[in-house]
Amino acid sequence: MAAANPFKVTDLVAKYGWQFMGYLANLGVNVPRNAAVIFVDSAATNATDADDTEHGHSFDKPCATLEYAIGLCTDGQGDVILIAPGHTETITTAAPCTVDISDLTIVGLGVGLNRPTFSLGTNTAATINVTAANVTIKNIRVVSALANVAIGITVAATATGVWIEDCELRDGGTSILELVIGISLAAAATDATILNCDFLTVTGGG
């Protein structure tokens, strides 16, 4: 489902000026002219998962979840999702957060523990599931909130060209809350890049 009211690059420039394009370039994000840019921040007072003329168009009125924001994107368009520092999101079911939009770039803002954090819990099959080609994921934290969570980020055979950079995948602070596999790549997921990622466990963890 693409957004009924997409916030395009032209809207971004009209609202924030051309300097915002320089900001995106500094993040290593190349935004095509026709792409949509969607903002996500669970901590914002006005955060709502709604496809209207306001939410997701700025950090003043962002979407509340990455999962919803993905559903607003268009396949093959080069859309970008920006996730605010301090964003938190819990993935709790076996029907995971699925990145099924090709040429999508997801960028977390912030540093250290302030980076967007995705907690996997309730079901050991909870995961961020990448199924589309040419997906980029940058600067997020994926943390186990349950014993023996199987996989942090699952890359399917259809997700050729995936790029995962500057991400942290880790146990949930104790050896009990173990993340068994940080990133799982299907054998047919060719042209994958995993760059500058941290895979962390605690004493007694796996």
Q: Where do the language-model regions lie?
A:
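Intrinsically disordered, low-complexity regulatory segments
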Residues: 1-28, 131-132, 144-147, 159, ...
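Right-handed parallel beta-helix/beta-solenoid
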Residues: 2-68, 85
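Beta-strand-rich, repetitive solenoid scaffolds
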Residues: 6-9, 63, 71-72, 108, ...
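Short, T/G/N/S-enriched strand-turn elements that build extracellular solenoid repeat scaffolds
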Residues: 28-29, 51-52, 66-75, 89-101, ...
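Detector for repetitive beta-architecture
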Residues: 37, 78-80, 86-88, 96-98, ...
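Glycine-rich repeat segments that build the extracellular carbohydrate-interaction surface of secreted
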Residues: 38-44, 64-90, 104-110
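Right-handed parallel beta-helix/beta-spiral solenoid domain characteristic of secreted/periplasmic
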Residues: 90-91, 102-151, 172-174
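Right-handed parallel beta-helix
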Residues: 136-206
